[in-house]
């Protein structure tokens, strides 16, 4: 068994590891909101995921593909170009397994 097949958090093989599911259940609040960066330009910001032990770069990549937009992950936030609040909320609930109660859209 290779070292990258073992979860660094719990030490179990990755196929038996449940750390990510447990961390998704214990997320306090994921905030999804928009912010105007320039006149006529809006970005969607997702924050509160860094506490869950989730790979922000990987999730940002999935969200960019789902929303067909550009974006980045930095400083504990995912920033997507455009207003994608509802798409992001549905994606996090249906495809990533987060609880509806843990997501706040403003």
Curated annotation (Swiss-Prot):
GO molecular function terms noted in the UniProt entry: mRNA binding; translation initiation factor activity
One of the GO BP terms on file: regulation of translation
SUPFAM superfamilies in the cross-refs: eIF1-like
Keyword Metal-binding: no
Domain of life from the UniProt record: Archaea
Keywords from the UniProt entry: Protein biosynthesis, Translation regulation
Pfam families given in the database record: SUI1
Keyword Protein biosynthesis assigned: yes
CDD domains in the record: YciH_like (cd11567)
Similarity field: Belongs to the SUI1 family.
Name of this protein: Protein translation factor SUI1 homolog
